[in-house]
Amino acid sequence: MSLMIRSSYVSHITLFQPRNSKPSSFTNQISFLSSSNNNPFLNLVYKRNLTMQSVSKMTVKSSLIDPDGGELVELIVPETEIGVKKAESETMPKVKLNQIDLEWVHVISEGWASPLKGFMREDEYLQSLHFNSLRLKNGTFVNMSLPIVLAIDDDTKEQIGSSENVALVCPQGDIIGSLRSVEIYKHNKEERIARTWGTTSPGLPYVEEYITPSGNWLIGGDLEVFEPIKYNDGLDHYRLSPKQLREEFDNRQADAVFAFQLRNPVHNGHALLMNDTRKRLLEMGYKNPVLLLHPLGGFTKADDVPLDVRMEQHSKVLEDGVLDPKTTIVSIFPSPMHYAGPTEVQWHAKARINAGANFYIVGRDPAGMGHPTEKRDLYDPDHGKRVLSMAPGLEKLNILPFRVAAYDTIEKKMAFFDPSRAKEFLFISGTKMRTYARTGENPPDGFMCPSGWNVLVKYYESLQESEAKQQAVVSA
């Protein structure tokens, strides 16, 4: 799929969000104006019920968006209680977690899924699966488009029996926390897959890795984690929790935070978009917009570039000044990747609300993939941004769709696509980029910063060496 980047912006809006108060009533609905208007800033208007005024009359004050439910959930046991809680957990039935289970424990415990306080019980699961949202006690709704559940097999269910609490055991064998007041219910895999992905075709990466081999039961309950989840992979310092990110935004006195998620290396088209977004936010009247560059750090499919390589590449982008370190925060989003298109992109946006971002950049075919059995995209590439503009529970988040960027063969750089010069632009797909790196061929000058590109070349060289050694062993 081509790396097509779209961006449009809000023009002439008034925002007044005093610190420590609730944000303005702001809807994420979008309407596209006539394409004959050449100003990209006017191609998108956010409808809301505040009076529209000129930018020159705008009043902007620094304030972060409220987390879903009004309070950020943190489920780490206080240090003074850890000894007692650990002793209690030793007497509980044990539930063994796999790596993706652990990633979900990480997500829930830090509050990315606020107001969710544990793996879903059946009522929460059904609301998420059928309505993409959860109803709170006060009657309001928050977005929750992906079921966050823990599967167990028949033997584990039998061992739990009538116990109200269970201990959670990480893949390395240590007890890391517990689920309390548990509820066990049937895991209807086919229904879950069909409703989440819109297909039950074989070849869905998350399904084959996680759901198909999982147990026939789901267990929900209130989560307690003894210590923050660490992976000891040299990247934990990048894994800032929503609370830590909010504190960092405050420390930098950010009055707007725009989040950009990716699971690929950053090329200059991405950088063009992010830098242009900041420029437009400044034109809107914001004084200190901060970019949250937020690569996904959980499960990804086998042919995606590994997290450690991506993080090294991202660091080179900042070192080379392609992105400004003073106005950019690079952090890892710990969620596993579903590749569930418009359903999943709602989760990605919702989690950034809890982290304090009030603008979210969405691109072509977000969270999408090629159809696993047919030669076509699994989802309509434009549906992701359209769904975000209408999704219940995301009204307070401002959605910024991408503007198309491609390689300008005349200017020798990544630039916003000009339809009147269509033949002078080159779209470099992710597949093409990987082919360049694997074969040692350099992409066109200006596509990616050289030091960042070298990171990818070295990775693919090491991958080829490893594959050659494995082949030699097989052939021996």
UniProtKB/Swiss-Prot annotation:
Subunit record text: Homotetramer.
EC number(s) from the headed UniProt entry: 2.7.7.4
GO BP: any one term: hydrogen sulfide biosynthetic process
Protein name: ATP sulfurylase 2
Induction: In roots, upon sulfur starvation.
NCBIfam families to which the protein is assigned, alphabetical: sopT
Record keywords, A-Z: ATP-binding, Chloroplast, Cytoplasm, Nucleotide-binding, Nucleotidyltransferase, Plastid, Transferase, Transit peptide
GO cellular component: chloroplast; chloroplast stroma; nucleus
Pathway where it operates: Sulfur metabolism; hydrogen sulfide biosynthesis; sulfite from sulfate: step 1/3
Native source organism of the sequence: Arabidopsis thaliana
Transit peptide: 1-56
InterPro entries given in the database record: ATP-Sase_PUA-like_dom, PUA-like_sf, Rossmann-like_a/b/a_fold, Sulfurylase_cat_dom, Sulphate_adenylyltransferase
An example Gene Ontology molecular-function term: ATP binding
Catalytic activity from the UniProt record: sulfate + ATP + H(+) = adenosine 5'-phosphosulfate + diphosphate
Domain of life: Eukaryota
Gene3D superfamilies registered for this protein in UniProt: HUPs (3.40.50.620), Sulfate adenylyltransferase (3.10.400.10)
Family stated for the protein in its record: Belongs to the sulfate adenylyltransferase family.
Reported tissue expression: Mostly expressed in leaves or cotyledons.
